[in-house]
Design a protein with these regions (language model features):
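N-terminal amphipathic/basic-hydrophobic helices that include classical n-h-c signal peptides
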Residues: 1-18
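Short Gly/Pro-enriched turn/cap motifs at secondary-structure boundaries
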Residues: 71-73, 161, 194-198, 386-390
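Divalent metal-coordination and catalytic microenvironments
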Residues: 42, 83, 94, 126, ...
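Histidine/acidic-residue-rich, glycine-tolerant segments that coordinate divalent metal ions
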Residues: 79, 101, 109-121, 127-128, ...
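Metal-dependent amide/peptide-bond hydrolase catalytic core
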Residues: 230-500
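Conserved short loop/turn motifs at secondary-structure junctions
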Residues: 47-48, 156-160, 308-313
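Acidic/His- and Gly-rich active-site-bordering loop/insert found
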Residues: 20-122, 127, 131-152
């Protein structure tokens, strides 16, 4: 790929791809204030997954006002968006997320000060995530129109990445079947189009049903559902020694009874089971279920297993990484102001240098020593992580099993600060987050335009994708006919509001 590639437009003149990109980038620059306002508005909404009513409506309305054909409520999710402009091939997709996380609300200040006590916050930067994809899609639309170029730009608004994997339902509904390639962006603490995979995961709830009784007067008549939950947890914790080193199993007790003097007749736990590959998760999941059944036998309770689904491991794309990295370098990384650096330095006081070093080493960052005293990364890195597996999981992975896809990162969080934290919330609403947004939007727009105007790039990406799959085929996890858990999401969202 070269930025000097030329091709015929709708007239007789020659067009360079850099001319088309600069048109898209100019639209982003001209609308910088509007884009940051949308980003900040979504930051303020901070809505739970599958309940992102205001955030999704804002994005959908903005796309509609800019000429996109918009469908809101696809794949059985009221907050899922499918919007497109143009016609014909190629069809290039962008993806935007806009769900927030519970318990990490914070003001845009470099210390812990909740905006709402125990409230929701964008501790993974999804206010930036969704706005970036929206902005890039609109910018591409105007660039294509300006030069009379064909093809279709399609925006996917994907709810509930953090809890229910909204993209999975969109994949199962066939909404990606005609797409040629897909580009996503995620705020992070580095500027890189990475090549690591992600952990596959299963999400499952275990519901136990027993009998109530007076815990002091006649406990022999009770059968404690909470005992079953606790015995199951003990069993799983003993099992940890006997699974692969890379596996991760974590849980919360969602319901444990009302008060101590009543034997609880209902209790439940929510588990995540992760491993680097789907075929490693499944056997661990079966063992966890056996432990759950054993706990029910020991306590004479009834068990209901609610396998809410899971996620695949990500299929990386060197071809798409090269395209994105080249566009990152064309755009240039953000320049941090003195105010940005002071803000970041204050946040850096909230964690230790030792934990930062541990993180850099764990992520195998090249020449990690030079980043020990860096708070905001200002350079663009070449991907170093091919063959590695990141600790987290993402529903972008499920998309990557059906089409070539990538999710690149731009620096937004303070280097060394944890994800899903008040620190990330503060950065996501600050000028640091705004600069990450603009950089990412331009990078995504340029990358999409390369794919739309260079057929060879798409051929290369598709050939690599097929090779990496090694003949494996995407199959639904759990019940293929399951529906998004809308009622459950609303109940959780209401409960979280009650805590706030």
């Amino acid at each position: 790929m070269t930025p000097l590639t030329t091709f015929l437009g709708s007239g007789t003149h020659l067009i360079t791809i850099i001319m088309v990109k600069e048109t898209a980038w100019k639209w982003i620059d001209d609308h910088r204030d509007q884009l940051t306002e949308i980003c900040d508005t979504i930051w303020g909404y901070a809505e739970y997954g599958l309940c992102e009513d205001k955030s999704s409506r804002l994005i959908a309305d903005t796309l509609s006002k800019n000429g996109f054909k918009v469908k809101l409520g696809v794949a059985g999710m009221p907050t899922a968006i499918l919007a497109e402009w143009g016609e014909g091939r190629p069809i290039i997709a962008t993806q935007g997320e806009y769900d927030a996380l519970p318990g990490i609300s914070n003001k845009v200040v470099p210390w812990k000060e909740p905006l709402v006590e125990d409230g929701m916050g964008h501790g993974c930067g999804h206010n930036i995530h969704g706005t970036t994809a929206m902005a890039a899609s609109i910018a591409v639309r105007y660039a294509l129109e300006a030069f009379g170029l064909g093809g279709t730009i399609r925006f996917y608004g994907t709810p509930a990445e953090e809890n229910f994997g909204g993209k999975v339902f969109m994949v199962l509904d066939g909404l990606y079947d005609d797409v040629d390639a897909c580009i996503s962006h995620h705020p992070s603490d580095m500027n890189v189009a990475g090549l690591s995979s992600s952990n596959a995961t299963n999400g499952v709830r275990f519901h136990y049903y027993g009998k109530t009784a007076h815990a002091a007067g006649n406990p022999e008549m009770g059968r404690s559902a909470l005992d079953a939950v606790e015995l199951m947890n003990v069993g799983v914790n003993y099992m940890r020694e006997h699974v692969i080193q890379e596996a991760r199993i974590h849980y919360v007790i969602e319901n444990g009874g009302g008060q101590p003097n009543v034997v609880p007749d209902y209790a439940s736990s929510w588990y995540y089971i992760r491993a680097p590959r789907r075929d490693q998760v499944d056997p661990i999941f079966e063992r966890v279920k056996k432990i759950a059944e054993g706990a029910a036998l020991m306590t004479e309770t009834e068990l209901k297993v609610d396998h809410s689904g899971g996620l695949y491991n990500l299929i990386p794309s060197r071809s798409l990484s090269d395209v994105v990295t080249a566009n990152m370098r064309l755009v240039g990384a953000p320049e941090w102001s003195e105010e940005d650096l002071e803000f970041a330095a204050e946040i850096a006081k909230s964690f230790t240098k030792e934990s930062k070093i541990d993180g850099l080493r764990k992520d195998k960052v090249p020449d990690w020593e030079k980043y020990v005293d860096v708070d905001l990364v200002a350079e663009i890195l070449d991907p170093w992580d091919e063959g590695e597996t990141s600790a987290g999981s993402t529903d972008v992975a499920d998309v990557s099993w059906v089409i070539p896809a990538i999710e690149f990162c731009t620096a937004c969080n303070v280097l060394g600060a944890p994800g899903h934290s008040w620190q990330f919330v503060a950065c996501s609403g600050s000028s640091i987050g705004h600069k990450s947004l603009i950089f990412a939007s331009k990078t995504m727009a340029g990358s999409v335009l390369d794919l739309m105007t260079s057929p060879d790039l798409l051929v290369k990406a598709k050939e690599e994708h097929e090779k990496r799959l090694e003949g494996q085929v995407y199959k639904p996890i759990g019940d293929p006919d399951r529906k998004p858990p809308l009622e459950q999401a609303r109940e959780i969202a209401e409960r979280l509001k009650g805590k706030a």
